[in-house]
């Protein structure tokens, strides 16, 4: 099966415990490698500049860059200051928008990091795709005079979307509501699966049922990319099995496996065997409730 991913590859400067590590990042990388680990072909729609020195590393992991991915402008670059379980995000450079024509992929992940996807592209994918996973973070982000990223309320058409992943802040800036009320509001806007991630507590709303899962307590290190791993695992599992409950267990199992590595950057991406073990355990511990 083939998965199309629309997002920037980034250069992430990760600052933690007094050290700064430079690593490739972005949903294009995290989702792409996760999908490859799950035996999917990946159709990568991204842009990188001449300063992106990690192309060979990603190609060795199975990702392919088209000629259209090359830009003369710098690669999108972030500084991530990790402060316990919280983080501050700063934009240091922004690459070109992604130009999208078409793809015969079985499913799409659209996960912009900052202004690389137009609403016109969003509309095209919404109309053309059978499965559409959407992470809206890049549409909600703004930048202040210091480069620090913050979120702002944004009117966005999210109809005809198969699944959306939001955290509490993103859900609030999309709906003006919190928790279950925000999830119901997103569903009413036309989303089939609402995936609400609040640190180690994850809730999925499908039809009139809520599914609650919990990642075991642990010391949390670098969380960069965990949400992307989650999105890719849900998407690949759902495309293979067409089972919403198993897909959310697989997604949470992938996030748990990534966190358990305690690794920085792409090294935290788990293999499918470990994800499968976690998912099987989670499947028997899901809590259900009616909306």
Segments from the language model and where they lie:
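Conserved phosphate/ATP/ADP-binding segment of small-molecule kinases
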Residues: 141-212
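Conserved post-catalytic alpha-helical subdomain immediately downstream of the catalytic base
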Residues: 193, 216-286
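Short glycine-enriched, charge-decorated loop/helix-capping segments at active-site entrances
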Residues: 17-23, 147-149, 180, 218
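Alpha-helix C-terminal capping segments
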Residues: 32-41, 237-240
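Short catalytic helix/loop segments, enriched in acidic residues and glycine
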Residues: 20-33
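Short, conserved phosphate/pyrophosphate- and ester-handling motifs at nucleotide-, phospho-/glycolipid
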Residues: 35, 167, 227
């Amino acid at each position: 099966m083939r998965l199309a991913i629309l997002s920037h590859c980034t250069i992430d400067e990760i600052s933690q415990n007094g050290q700064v590590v430079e690593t490739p990042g972005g949903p294009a990388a995290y989702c792409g490698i996760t999908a490859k680990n799950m035996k999917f072909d990946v159709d990568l729609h991204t842009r990188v500049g001449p300063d992106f020195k990690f192309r060979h590393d990603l190609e060795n992991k199975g990702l392919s860059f088209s000629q259209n991915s090359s830009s003369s402008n710098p690669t999108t670059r972030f500084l991530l200051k990790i402060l316990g379980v919280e983080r501050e995000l700063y934009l240091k450079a922004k690459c070109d928008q992604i130009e999208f024509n078409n793809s015969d992929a079985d499913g799409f992940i659209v996960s912009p990091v900052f202004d690389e996807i137009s609403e016109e592209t969003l509309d095209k994918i919404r109309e053309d795709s059978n499965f559409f996973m959407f992470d809206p973070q890049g549409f909600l982000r703004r930048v202040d005079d210091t480069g620090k990223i913050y979120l702002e309320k944004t009117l966005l058409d999210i109809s005809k979307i198969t699944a959306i992943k939001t955290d509490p802040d993103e859900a609030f800036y999309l709906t003006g509501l919190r928790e279950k009320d925000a999830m119901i509001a997103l569903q009413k806007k036309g989303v089939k699966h609402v995936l609400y991630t609040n640190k180690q507590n994850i809730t999925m709303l499908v039809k009139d049922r809520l599914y609650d899962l919990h990642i075991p307590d642990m010391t949390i290190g670098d969380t960069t990319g965990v949400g992307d791993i989650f999105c890719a695992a849900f998407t690949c599992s759902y495309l293979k099995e067409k089972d919403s409950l198993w897909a959310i267990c697989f997604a949470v199992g992938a996030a748990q496996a990534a966190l358990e590595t305690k690794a920085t950057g792409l090294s935290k991406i788990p293999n499918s065997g470990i994800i499968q073990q976690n998912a099987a355990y989670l499947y028997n511990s899901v809590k259900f409730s009616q909306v």
